[in-house]
Curated annotation (Swiss-Prot):
Belongs to the methyltransferase superfamily. RsmH family. It comes from the Bacteria. GO terms for molecular function: rRNA (cytosine-N4-)-methyltransferase activity. The lineage of its organism: Bacteria, Pseudomonadati, Chlorobiota, Chlorobiia, Chlorobiales. Specifically methylates the N4 position of cytidine in position 1402 (C1402) of 16S rRNA. It comes from Pelodictyon phaeoclathratiforme (strain DSM 5477 / BU-1). NCBIfam families: 16S rRNA (cytosine(1402)-N(4))-methyltransferase RsmH (TIGR00006). InterPro entries: RsmH, SAM-dep_MeTrfase_MraW_recog, SAM-dependent_MTases_sf. Keywords: Cytoplasm, Methyltransferase, rRNA processing, S-adenosyl-L-methionine, Transferase. This is Ribosomal RNA small subunit methyltransferase H. GO terms for cellular component: cytoplasm. Its main location: cytoplasm.
Amino acid sequence: MVMVRDIFHEPVLVNEVVAFLVRKPGIYVDGTLGGGGHSSAMLRALFDAGFLAGSLLIGIDQDDAALRVAGETLKEFAASTVLVKGNFCDMGGLIASICAEKGLEPKVMGILLDLGVSSFQINTPDRGFSYLREGPLDMRMDSNASRSAADIVNGYDEQELARLFYRYGEEPRSRSIARAIVAYRQKHGAVTYTQELAAIIRGNAHGGEKVIKTLSRVFQALRIEVNAELDVLRQALYDGIDCLDETGRMAIISYHSLEDRIVKRVFAEKARSDWGPKGVGLREPLSWGSVAPVTRKPLIAAPDEIALNSRARSAKLRVIEKIHEGGRRASE
C-alpha cells in the first residue's frame, strides 16, 4: 500500500492540536478525518498519557478513499476508534447514534475540524479540484453528491457566476470572467474539463502571479459552492459546541479569510453573555456565554513547519473551551 504521507497531506499544526485537545480520557471527534494524521497523533497521545482505555475517537469523512486510508493508518487503535462516512455538519446526530450503540453519554472532550480540500483530492485529477491537472470539472468532496462544478459553470447565468466568484473567491475580475464563461458556452458548448475552464480564466486575467491567484480564487469559489462549505461550517460549529462536555474543547484550522471569519464570529457569539438592552442594569445576564477562548488570537505555523509543509503557510488555529454557566474556564 502507498504510504499515507504520499497521498494525503501531512497534518498541519499537529503538535498544537494535540496539546490543546488531549488532556483527559473521553470522546474525541475528528470531523475531517482525511488520511488520519491528526487522529493518529491524538490516539498516540491518549495512549502515552494512559487515557486510551477510557477514550473513543470518532472519525468522520465524506470521502470513501479517505476512510479506507485512515482505517489502515489507525488499525493499531482500531478498538478505540469508530470511522463513519458523513459530513461534519451532521456530527451531532452521528455522535448521538454511535454513543447510543456503545452505551456512552454523548458528551465530547475534544473536536477537531481541519478545513479545506485535502492534498489527496487536489492531486487526484478525476476529482477535478485543481486547475493544474486535467480532469472532469467535478469538485465534489462526496462523490455521490448530485451537483458538480460543471453543473454550476454551465447552469448559472452571467450574473450568478459573477456574484459567486466575488462572494466566495473575492475575485475582483469576477464580472469579466463570468462574461467570458458564458460567451464560451454560447460558442463552444458546455465547459466540462478543468483545463478548459482554466484556459478561459487565463484569457481574462492579468499575467504573472495574478493569473495564479485568479485561478485559485475562481476554483475556490466553485468548490465552496459545490460543497456548500460555509453553510456546512456554520452548522458544524453550532452543533459541535452543543456536543462538548464541560471543559471540552473545539479546535478549528482554517485556510482562508472566509472560513476564519465565520469561526471567529461564531466563537465570539457563543462566548458572549446577553445582558439585555443597555441601561437595564441586570444583576445577571439573561443568558450566559457557553464557551471561552483558549487562543485569544489564531495560532499560525512556525517557519520550520512551513518549510516542510507549504500547506501550513495559510493555516490558522482557533480553540475554545466549554465553560460552567456563569463561570470561567475550569482550567483557569
